[in-house]
């Protein structure tokens, strides 16, 4: 399928409105054109600083604006992060993602995160961070330290965004993605479904992502995990079929991107997840927790992979890895 960055909302809506089986069939066809069938990229996500975030994202347990009963934690030691990364690699993860509950990293935090990137990279894993908004200098220093991916989700459509967050703008998020691109890193950016948004908002989110100058290399599609004490604690749960439709449409309009199953997966059956893989999802977060929300554990994931005949993708060699191999030849 031809790579496009000029999708219209009308075209994306037409995909959403296809009969479900036709949509999933098309998505699987597109997936097999661009990726190895039955292979899933596995990532692990670790919270390196938890809670007391100054942002007011209405879905988030880490926001200081809400009483979610979350116990805040200070930055964890780099040595602890490396230990967790080694365990993740041993369990089959090819990418290690590190997240901090910050609006943006302060300059005093930069030596800490840069050391972390270098140490995890030295393990032979792909590296990813989500630290909030970045400026251009911070993005460039992260790239120089060896960071492969930077995650900064758009969360929802531009139109619905102000219903969810007021402490940073939609364009603030786009600016950070631009800084990441200019620095030469890969982009991880997606959103959350089930926030009380309409299908038109889900279309709007995917339209924003698919019309970026370069599609995000990874697109996480989160299902809201309602957190007691947050404004969205009692929001009506989105139908799983609608979530899978969103995955399928994302696969079709961003054919080269990894489509990742993220938050909300622990509540899904094996059959639901199998349908999501059929719809073109080819990445997931493994481990018992995603930052502060529960997640399917590694044992459950391996059992699911065995049941479905899936294998975990191996880490891709970096330019530096290839250079070392060439020198050794």
From Swiss-Prot:
Gene responsible for this protein: bioB
Protein name: Biotin synthase
Lineage summary: Bacteria, Pseudomonadati, Pseudomonadota, Gammaproteobacteria, Moraxellales
Example of a GO MF term: iron ion binding
GO BP of this protein: biotin biosynthetic process
Pathway entry: Cofactor biosynthesis; biotin biosynthesis; biotin from 7,8-diaminononanoate: step 2/2
Catalytic activity: (4R,5S)-dethiobiotin + (sulfur carrier)-SH + 2 reduced [2Fe-2S]-[ferredoxin] + 2 S-adenosyl-L-methionine = (sulfur carrier)-H + biotin + 2 5'-deoxyadenosine + 2 L-methionine + 2 oxidized [2Fe-2S]-[ferredoxin]
Cited function: Catalyzes the conversion of dethiobiotin (DTB) to biotin by the insertion of a sulfur atom into dethiobiotin via a radical-based mechanism.
EC annotation from Swiss-Prot or TrEMBL: 2.8.1.6
């Amino acid at each position: 399928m031809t790579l496009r960055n000029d999708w219209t909302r009308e075209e994306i809506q037409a995909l959403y409105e296809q009969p479900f089986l036709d949509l999933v069939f098309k998505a699987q066809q597109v997936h097999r054109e661009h990726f190895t069938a039955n292979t899933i990229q596995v990532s692990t996500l670790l919270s390196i600083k938890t809670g007391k975030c100054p942002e007011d994202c209405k879905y988030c347990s880490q926001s200081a604006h809400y009483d979610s009963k979350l116990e805040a934690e200070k930055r964890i030691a780099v040595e602890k992060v490396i230990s967790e990364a080694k365990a993740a690699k041993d369990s089959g993860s090819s990418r290690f993602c590190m997240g901090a509950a910050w609006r943006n990293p302060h300059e005093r935090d930069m030596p800490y995160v840069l050391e972390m990137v270098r140490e995890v990279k030295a393990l032979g894993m792909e590296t990813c961070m989500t630290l909030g908004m970045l400026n251009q200098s911070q993005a460039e220093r992260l790239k120089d330290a060896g960071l492969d991916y930077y995650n900064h989700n758009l969360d929802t459509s531009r139109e619905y965004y102000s219903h969810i967050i007021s402490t940073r703008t939609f364009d603030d998020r786009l600016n950070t993605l631009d800084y990441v691109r200019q620095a030469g890193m890969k982009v991880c950016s997606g959103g959350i479904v089930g926030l009380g948004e309409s299908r038109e908002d889900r279309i709007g989110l995917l339209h924003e992502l698919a019309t970026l100058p370069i599609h995000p290399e990874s697109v996480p599609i989160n299902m809201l995990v309602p957190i007691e004490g947050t404004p969205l604690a009692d929001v009506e749960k989105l139908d799983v079929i609608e979530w899978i439709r969103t995955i399928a449409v994302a696969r079709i309009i961003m054919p080269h991107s990894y489509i990742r199953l993220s938050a909300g997966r622990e509540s899904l059956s094996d059959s639901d997840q199998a349908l999501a893989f059929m719809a073109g999802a080819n990445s997931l977060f493994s481990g018992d927790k995603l930052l502060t929300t529960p997640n399917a554990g590694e044992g459950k994931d391996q059992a699911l992979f065995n049941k479905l005949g899936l294998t975990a993708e191996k880490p891709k060699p970096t330019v530096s890895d290839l250079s070392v191999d060439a020198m050794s030849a």
